Amino acid sequence: MKTTTKFFTFILIVSVFTILSAQQKNDKFGKDKKEISKMLDDFNGAAAKADFTTYFNYFADESTFIGTDATEVWDKQAFMIWAKPYFDKKKTWNFTSLKRNIYFAKDDKLAWFDELLDTQMKICRGSGVVEKIEGQWKVKQYVLSVTVPNDVVDKVVAEKSSLEDVLIQQLKNK
């Protein structure tokens, strides 16, 4: 009887520690999810306010912005150069998250997200990777995509074909 009691006591103790450990992990992810979500909201808010310095401080030094046009793949410095005139003229973008998902790597230093955004282009999708650098979440890669409802995809393809056929040939010839 004593062996059975010791065994069940051992199982109970292991179970409690497992539950507490899982709870701590969930609390950490919950805290980090809130931090990342706030960072992304503030990131979008800085763009809407045309606050160049604040907006670009959310990017890691080594980061990439991928825009809606197939030719728009910029490192941070190139994106800053491209965006500066828009910020100077206060003609920036205003994105508001409608729905956001955040996922974590096992090391808790990398996370990735996808979100649906309310924009001047209607619904867009923002997605990217963030890294915890010196205690702050920074954007490592951001991808902005225009969503296309399935019911109109054929019309959109027809509209862009003449422009993108040229680019397709250029890319194939490289």
Regions found by a protein language model. Name each.
Residues D107-A111, K122, G128, K132-I133, ...:
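Extended, well-structured beta-strand/loop surface patches
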Residues M1-D27:
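Bacterial Sec-dependent N-terminal signal peptides
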Residues F59, D69, K99, K106, ...:
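A mature extracytoplasmic/lumenal domain signature
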